Design a protein with these regions (language model features):
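Charged, low-complexity intrinsically disordered terminal segments
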Residues: 1-190
Length: 190
């Protein structure tokens, strides 16, 4: 936490990493769903779903999805089935957690159950590793993160599985979609 706090207070570093590399956008529309979206068919939830469906359906070249758990509804699978039949067929690229990187094994199991179906829909699926080979290039002092940690809850509950790699286990939690490099949907980047 101390190392991260020092980086967060380093204004030149923040500017170099985030401000200098920022892209200009021409238009931003904000839409959200209700917290209890699964319990409601409210107008705002239906409108949000329709907007997302229309954006994805408009894809001409690529749909790039980033999600920690690749679990699609029946309607979403139908949409991607229609895209597969389209000429030219847009490339569907998915970045998601691997089993080793996920924090929700049961959701990964559900995703794995449907993986063949997603591949038949033409998805190119890339799974995030918990210890990426280039983590030290992406995160300053990566090997020092987690040093001296005393969190052994997992050991107590599941038994020991000693790590042979320095650094902390990484996992993806961001949810986003980029369509044709032009439209971006950002879910919860937390």
């Amino acid at each position: 936490v101390g190392i991260l706090g020092a980086h967060a207070g380093n204004q030149p570093e923040i500017s170099r990493r985030f401000v200098d590399t920022a892209l200009r956008v021409s238009q931003v529309d904000y839409f959200s769903d209700q917290p209890q979206k699964q319990d409601s068919k409210s107008d705002s939830n239906v409108e949000l779903g329709d907007r997302i469906e229309n954006l994805i359906a408009s894809a001409q070249s690529t749909v790039l999805m980033q999600t920690p758990y690749l679990v699609l509804s029946g309607d979403a699978r139908d949409l991607f089935g229609r895209l597969k039949e389209q000429e030219p067929r847009p490339q569907i690229i998915v970045s998601t957690n691997s089993l080793a990187a996920t924090d929700a094994f049961y959701v990964y199991a559900l995703s794995h159950k449907y993986k063949k179906r997603y591949l038949k829909l033409g998805f190119s699926i890339y799974e995030f590793k918990p210890f990426p080979a280039d983590a030290d290039l992406l995160i300053n002092d990566y090997a020092l993160l987690g040093a001296g940690s005393t969190n052994n809850y997992g050991y107590q509950r599941y038994g020991q599985a000693p790590l042979t790699i320095q650094g902390v286990r990484l996992g993806m939690h961001a949810k986003s979609i980029v369509i044709d490099g032009q439209a971006t949907l950002i879910g919860s980047h937390n």
